[in-house]
Amino acid sequence: MPSFDIVSKMNEVDLRNAVDNAVREVSTRFDFRGVEATIELKDLTVTLRSESDFQVRQLEDLFRNHCSKRNLSTSGVEIEDEPVHSGKFYTLTMTFKQGIDQPTAKEIVKYIKDTKAKVQTSIQGDKVRVTGKKRDDLQETIALLKKSNIELPLQYENFRD
């Protein structure tokens, strides 16, 4: 029986490259001259620090731009609403999610069942397994999920006939 897995993984190498490129651009931009502005990555958490709220928002926009250039989706990112002010710095933390959490997995399963597709779904840890009788049914399910408004970037792997 054909099957595939729905996962949500962040490519850490591309994330590191996006951070490095953003740091390089910050060092050459005129509006950040003489300003202490940093972008740091640690365990899928990106920390943006600068001297003003406006500059932190500029760093966020710049970083999102570099992520999009590397085909990294920022839709599944947990981000603070307001930058935290401590001392003379404003700090904004962006945490990238790895894997599909239980509520989102249930939402994916419910979405697939509501479309009345001829497939079976099961939640297996941080991924969702989809099985069907025909390969066409699985490809139809992938197309439906790409059109859905699920907030995580989804990848499809382990496609078996």
UniProtKB/Swiss-Prot annotation:
<comment type="similarity">
    <text>Belongs to the YajQ family.</text>
</comment>
<dbReference type="GO" id="GO:0000166">
    <property type="term" value="F:nucleotide binding"/>
</dbReference>
<dbReference type="InterPro" id="IPR007551">
    <property type="entry name" value="DUF520"/>
</dbReference>
<keyword id="KW-0547">Nucleotide-binding</keyword>
<dbReference type="Pfam" id="PF04461">
    <property type="entry name" value="DUF520"/>
</dbReference>
<dbReference type="InterPro" id="IPR035571">
    <property type="entry name" value="UPF0234-like_C"/>
</dbReference>
<dbReference type="InterPro" id="IPR035570">
    <property type="entry name" value="UPF0234_N"/>
</dbReference>
<protein>
    <recommendedName>
        <fullName>Nucleotide-binding protein lpg1167</fullName>
    </recommendedName>
</protein>
<comment type="function">
    <text>Nucleotide-binding protein.</text>
</comment>
<dbReference type="GO" id="GO:0005829">
    <property type="term" value="C:cytosol"/>
</dbReference>
<dbReference type="InterPro" id="IPR036183">
    <property type="entry name" value="YajQ-like_sf"/>
</dbReference>
